[in-house]
Amino acid sequence: MAGWFTETQNKAYKDAMSALNANPTIDLENSYVPLQNQYKDIRVDEHPEYLHDKEWAQATYNGDLVGIKTSDVMLGVYVPKEEDVGLGMELGYAMSQGKYVLLVIPDELYGESINLMSWGVADNVIKMSELATFDFNRPRYNFYDGAVY
């Protein structure tokens, strides 16, 4: 999903989760959501001291890779001008694993320039308002309407 390190990223994450809960073509209960699968349920947004804990970091990293490998779709919530390096790595990894990569951009930011590499791995880029009705049973390719940098 998204980074959740800034207010804008956190709002986008919450909006995406709300839209996914409303989408009848996705089984969110059995989907891998990184923030809901932190090692030992330790959330570093609540306990930043664990960012220095190698065990937590390695287990969380490996858990996210397992989540990508065992999922059909990689959905990345992308906030232009606030790119999350971790999301970029996960997008590339998902593509290398043959996963369908869907980027979701908040409506008010849709059309802004996005990173060329994130654009390149995406099979489709949609507005947040389209996520609740996106048909995950019929994924399609489409171009992003905005520019790249």
UniProtKB/Swiss-Prot annotation:
Its EC number is 2.4.2.6. GO terms for biological process: nucleotide salvage. GO terms for molecular function: nucleoside deoxyribosyltransferase activity. The keyword Glycoprotein does not apply. Gene3D superfamilies: 3.40.50.450. Pathway: Nucleotide metabolism; nucleotide salvage pathway. InterPro entries: Nucleoside_deoxyribTrfase (IPR007710). Keywords: Nucleotide metabolism, Transferase. Disulfide bonds: none annotated. It catalyses: 2-deoxy-D-ribosyl-base(1) + base(2) = 2-deoxy-D-ribosyl-base(2) + base(1). The active site is at 90 (nucleophile). It comes from the Bacteria. Catalyzes the cleavage of the glycosidic bond of 2'-deoxyribonucleosides and the transfer of the deoxyribosyl moiety to an acceptor purine or pyrimidine base. Belongs to the nucleoside deoxyribosyltransferase family. This is Nucleoside deoxyribosyltransferase.
